[in-house]
């Protein structure tokens, strides 16, 4: 998704700062884009580390003088029963998915405010940011927190009369590698092993057939132009959002029926 957003920025004539945990692929991509005439700065960054994101902001403002669009997009995923995932697994996901967004806000927003000019911040949540499901505890918690954080930021910027706008991106299946982001975080002896395998197969199939990142990016930029807070990529999930809200207002108990455990 991040690469799709970067390519869309470049297609619209912008200068881009790229961040990724892996230095070698990041530099290769930057060289490829620069070779095609793009203005690109690449900064290896672990978004879980506040000092890394602060250095990323320094590089962006030093290199280009200003930042008008900020995309807090890094994300990872693990599955398994909530009580089976280790504290380290919980911390790993929350540090990247949630705290990475917090670090982005803290490092970039004060300087963007000081510019006193229009700008936009897009935080990537997920379908899971609005709909919980079994076996996705750490991921769902992190993504629902990103929704709450982005709403809070929206209200705060509104309260001070800022020209900065915010959006939260809640994508459905997008053709990315997120299903494999948890390699190396295997579940130990687990009562959820079969259900976990079923879920991951379901996710991988959906992601493989998912929306192209370029199409996702096009929707994001349309929302930026229209100053829309909520960005959805798959309208077919809206009935599920509505059903959840209706159940909540009726005081009903949640029911999950996408697949059986």
Language-model features and meaning:
Residues 126:
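Residue(s) in the substrate-gating loop at a strand-loop-helix junction
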Residues 81-82, 86-91:
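Substrate-binding pocket helix/loop in short-chain dehydrogenase/reductase
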